[in-house]
């Protein structure tokens, strides 16, 4: 796959970022290089290789799933423009 300036401009538009026109050609070359590396990764023979997520065995301690108020509801509600009974008060948005 090869990217040109028009494709870079379209990607920038979709990502809602501004890329100056004079940088689009350079960015297209960089993205083409990255895509080349990704294509090379696709050529690697991984048959028989077990997937791993980490090279360190990790086990997480389990804890009880208990609902709490976090210990400081007053501080949390203090950030709200308006609150009532430890809850944020917001305008009604659905009729």
Curated annotation (Swiss-Prot):
Record has Nucleotide-binding as a keyword: yes
Single GO MF annotation: asparaginyl-tRNA synthase (glutamine-hydrolyzing) activity
Keyword flag NAD: no
Catalyzed reaction equations: L-glutamyl-tRNA(Gln) + L-glutamine + ATP + H2O = L-glutaminyl-tRNA(Gln) + L-glutamate + ADP + phosphate + H(+); L-aspartyl-tRNA(Asn) + L-glutamine + ATP + H2O = L-asparaginyl-tRNA(Asn) + L-glutamate + ADP + phosphate + 2 H(+)
GO annotation terms (biological process): glutaminyl-tRNAGln biosynthesis via transamidation; regulation of translational fidelity; translation
Disulfide bond annotation, renumbered to this chain: none
Alphabetized UniProt keyword annotations: ATP-binding, Ligase, Nucleotide-binding, Protein biosynthesis
The protein's Enzyme Commission number: 6.3.5.-
Annotated function: Allows the formation of correctly charged Asn-tRNA(Asn) or Gln-tRNA(Gln) through the transamidation of misacylated Asp-tRNA(Asn) or Glu-tRNA(Gln) in organisms which lack either or both of asparaginyl-tRNA or glutaminyl-tRNA synthetases. The reaction takes place in the presence of glutamine and ATP through an activated phospho-Asp-tRNA(Asn) or phospho-Glu-tRNA(Gln).
Family: Belongs to the GatC family.
NCBIfam families found in the cross-reference section: gatC (TIGR00135)
Subunit: Heterotrimer of A, B and C subunits.
Protein name in the entry: Aspartyl/glutamyl-tRNA(Asn/Gln) amidotransferase subunit C
Origin species: Rhodospirillum centenum (strain ATCC 51521 / SW)
């Amino acid at each position: 796959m090869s990217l040109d300036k028009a494709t870079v401009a379209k990607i920038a538009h979709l990502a809602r970022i501004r890329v100056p026109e004079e940088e689009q050609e350079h960015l297209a070359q960089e993205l083409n290089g990255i895509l080349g590396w990704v294509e090379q990764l696709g050529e690697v023979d991984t048959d028989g290789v077990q997937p791993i997520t980490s090279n360190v065995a990790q086990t997480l301690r389990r804890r009880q799933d208990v609902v709490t108020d976090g210990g400081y509801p007053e501080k949390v509600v203090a950030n709200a423009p308006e609150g009532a009974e430890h809850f944020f008060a917001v305008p009604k948005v659905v009729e």
